[in-house]
Amino acid sequence: MVDTDKFDILLTQEEHLYAIFRRDVFWTDREHDTITWEDIKKCPLSLSGGSVRMIMQSSLTDMEQLNAVAITTTKSSAIEWASSGRTVSLVPMDAKELINHRKMARIKLPEFSGDFKKAFITLKGHALSPVAQQFIDFYKAYV
C-alpha cells in the first residue's frame, strides 16, 4: 500500500480500458464500433501492467479465462504486439490519447469505465524542476 501522506497529487486523469488491434486481422467481417468482452476473451491478448490491474479489480473475468500471450511493463510494448497482428492489446488510456499505427483500431471497452485514474505525483516538500513544471503545464493545457 502506498503511503499517500508522503505525496502531493499534482493532477489526475480518468482512464478507460481500450482494445487496440489490426483492422485487417481481427474482426474483418464487421464494423469496428464496438466489441464485446466475449469477443475479446476469444482472442490472443497482449496486456500492459495497467490493464492487468484494471481487469483484476473488476468482477467481469478471471485472468485464467483470458488467452494472454504477453503481459508487458509498458503500454507501447503491448501496442507493438497488436501492431504486428499477433494479438489484441488491452491498455488503459485517456480519451485524447491516439494510436498512430497504420491499420490499427482503438475501441473503448465500456465495461471497464469508471474509477480508474492516472496521477502525477511528487514527494511532499519537493519542488518540480523547470522542465517537469513545463511538462505539467503543457499536459494540463492538453487535457
Tell where the protein language model's regions lie, with residue ranges.
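Short secondary-structure boundary segments
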Residues: M1, R23, S51-V52, P92-A95, ...
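Hydrophobic hinge/microswitch elements
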Residues: G50-I107
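Structured helix-beta-strand junction loops
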Residues: E15, K42-C43, S84-G85, R102, ...
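Residues embedded in well-ordered beta-strands
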Residues: L10, Y18-I20, F26, V88, ...
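A late-sequence structural motif
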Residues: R106-V143
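Short beta-strand-centered segments that line the small-molecule binding cleft or hinge
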Residues: M1-L17, F21, A105-I107
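Secondary-structure junction motif
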Residues: W27-D29, D33-W37, K41-E64, L128-A132, ...
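Alpha-helical segments flanking ligand/cofactor-binding loops in enzyme cores
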Residues: L10, E38, I79-E80
